[in-house]
């Protein structure tokens, strides 16, 4: 579960390395965000010579959480870290590569570009 002030790893090559969640998009008073939710985040750590800079406010979609994800067939998926992919206003990823596995639920939420770039979809 991701809430305000949660630090996340970045799962793409956009130039950001660590994010901090500021807000969850789509509702006024929701406390937690899960896989597939869009958040507003600030960059806490960035790679040198990257187009994204530290303290820049961006949008990101959550692709991995430490909290379990229960599917309808009874399968439970849990990842080792909290990770997000930086996106633009249209929902397209800013990076050209995705690192690590992502959940199949992103395809149902119309993040097909992220799913196609991912090396493994669970």
Swiss-Prot record:
CDD domains: Ribosomal_uL14
Key words of the record: Chloroplast, Plastid, Ribonucleoprotein, Ribosomal protein, RNA-binding, rRNA-binding
Transmembrane segments: none
Keyword match Phosphoprotein: no
One protein family per Pfam: Ribosomal_L14
GO molecular function terms listed in the Swiss-Prot or TrEMBL record: rRNA binding; structural constituent of ribosome
GO biological process per UniProt: translation
Keyword Ribonucleoprotein attached: yes
Localization: Plastid, Chloroplast
A Gene Ontology cellular-component term: chloroplast
Description of how the protein assembles with itself and partners: Part of the 50S ribosomal subunit.
HAMAP family cross-referenced by the UniProt entry: Ribosomal_uL14
Family: Belongs to the universal ribosomal protein uL14 family.
Role noted for this protein: Binds to 23S rRNA.
The protein's name in its UniProt record: Large ribosomal subunit protein uL14c
């Amino acid at each position: 579960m991701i809430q305000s002030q949660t630090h996340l790893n970045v799962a793409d090559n956009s130039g950001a390395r660590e994010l901090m969640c500021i807000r969850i998009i789509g509702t006024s008073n929701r406390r937690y965000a899960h896989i597939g939710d869009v958040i507003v985040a600030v960059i806490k750590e960035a790679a040198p010579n990257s187009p994204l800079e530290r303290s820049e406010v961006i949008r990101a979609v959550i692709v991995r959480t430490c909290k379990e994800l229960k599917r309808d067939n009874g399968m439970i998926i849990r990842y080792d870290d909290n990770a997000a992919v930086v996106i633009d206003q249209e929902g397209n990823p800013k990076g050209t590569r995705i690192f690590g596995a992502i959940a199949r639920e992103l395809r149902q939420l119309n993040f097909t570009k992220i799913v196609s770039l991912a090396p493994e979809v669970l």
